[in-house]
Regions:
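Beta-rich nucleic-acid/ligand-interaction surfaces
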Residues: 32-51, 146-156, 250-259
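Short secondary-structure junctions
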Residues: 28-32, 243-244, 341-349
Length: 388
């Protein structure tokens, strides 16, 4: 009897297909408890995306936590011998705070981890599996690749204070050129140094041409070494790396990632569905000298591929609407004023109407007037195209 995969949701299909892919590449299934001793997360808090976890006192009196992360559990248990490389894949649920709802939420993940002796071949294999994981979704996808060494080497060369770095990296990730330049000046950099940091935002696009552009902007040997590693990755992958682009502004958490980082995107989903990178510092907390590389695919995000569009986005081909979520208050008023001056005013008086949705059919623009805290939720769930 042949299995009809069309009856499954995108996340269910991916789970079945990727299990075959990962096991064929030599990865073994890793199973872990839903709980870990809280001390594991307390001692490694800097490696967590959020320090908030749900804790409880178990029947034996020990303080435990509902698992917010799978990688920590694998790194703790892998313990590879010298020269050994251990390969695991997993399908697990984790529990993390949601920035949108301000509550804890369950997140379904499928991913893999490669821990131990990792060379250029092993690194290329993990990236190839990330590319094939995205390709299995059968929708347009792209994998954006970067290297933490390129960014951190520039910060070192510019003598950026350690306290200022997390904010600068956040602005790099957000591709916020204006705020990045201002924050760089505020951190003590001069105009030339601030411009050098902001220029990283232009280093994205096709792998080969972006790599060439980045070489011309290197200010130290460590940056050149990072680009050599990226060139080596491209050479190892060959034709298998066709779905890969380079984005050197893709900076991960400095406490976690120390080399290659990458994010995967699919058409129809507003944020990354796959994230991964090199995390030697975490692996070495449990196994001295070990290297580590892996990624996670966020299965919940894949369900968007089969979900019906919100009514406001069920558009015909005759007209395309731009749906904008505006916060009530002065920020929303200012943003609306700029848009109205550009010809995108609503047909009703924005400041006098009690309606929560106003629009201009001629201009093809629709505004949702929402609480500031709800702007991100409207965009996350696809009700609005952009939020301000």
């Amino acid at each position: 009897m042949q299995l009809d995969l069309s009856r499954f949701s995108p996340a269910e299909r991916s789970t079945l297909q990727l299990r075959v892919l990962y096991e064929g590449a030599g990865y073994r299934k890793f199973r872990c408890s839903h709980f870990e001793e809280y001390s594991l997360y307390q001692q490694n808090e800097r490696f967590l995306s959020d320090s908030q976890v749900i804790t409880f006192t178990d029947l034996d009196g020990k303080l435990r936590a509902i698992k917010p992360d799978v990688t920590l559990s694998i790194a703790k248990n892998a313990q590879p011998a010298a020269g050994e490389c251990k390969k695991y894949y997993y399908t697990e649920q984790i529990c993390r705070p949601s920035r949108e709802s301000h509550t804890f939420s369950e997140i379904s993940q499928m991913g893999l981890e490669c821990i131990g002796a990792i060379g250029a071949a092993e690194q290329a294999e993990v990236v190839r599996l990330a590319l094939e994981s995205l390709a299995s979704l059968e929708v347009p996808t792209v994998l954006e690749v970067s290297h933490m060494g390129f960014v951190t080497a520039l910060l070192d060369t510019l003598h950026v204070d350690a306290a200022a770095r997390p904010r600068l990296l956040e602005l790099l990730r957000d591709k916020n050129a204006h705020e990045l330049h201002a924050a760089a000046l505020q951190s003590g950099l001069d105009e030339a140094a601030a411009n050098a940091l902001t220029t990283i935002l232009s280093l994205h696009g096709p792998f080969g041409t972006t790599l060439a552009a980045a070489r011309s902007q290197c200010q130290c040997e460590a940056q050149r070494d990072a680009l050599l590693e990226l060139q080596s990755l491209q050479n190892e992958l060959g034709d298998a790396g066709r779905g890969m682009q380079l984005d050197l502004s893709l900076a991960g958490d400095m406490e976690y990632y120390n080399g290659l980082v990458f994010s995967g995107y699919v058409a129809g989903v507003p944020r990354a569905v796959l994230k991964g990178g090199r995390y030697d510092l975490l692996a070495q907390r449990f196994t001295p000298g070990a290297c580590a590389l892996g990624f996670a695919l966020y299965l919940d995000e894949l369900e968007r591929l089969s979900a019906p569009l919100p009514p406001v986005q069920q558009q015909g081909t005759e007209r395309q609407w731009l749906n904008i979520a505006l916060p009530k208050g002065r920020l929303g008023d200012k943003a609306y004023g700029l848009l109205a001056a550009a010809g995108y005013e609503a047909n009703e008086n924005y400041n006098e109407t009690r309606k929560l949705v106003v629009e201009n059919p001629e201009a093809g623009v629709r505004y949702f007037l929402v609480k500031p805290s709800d702007v991100a939720i409207y965009v996350e769930h696809g009700a609005a195209d952009i939020g301000i």
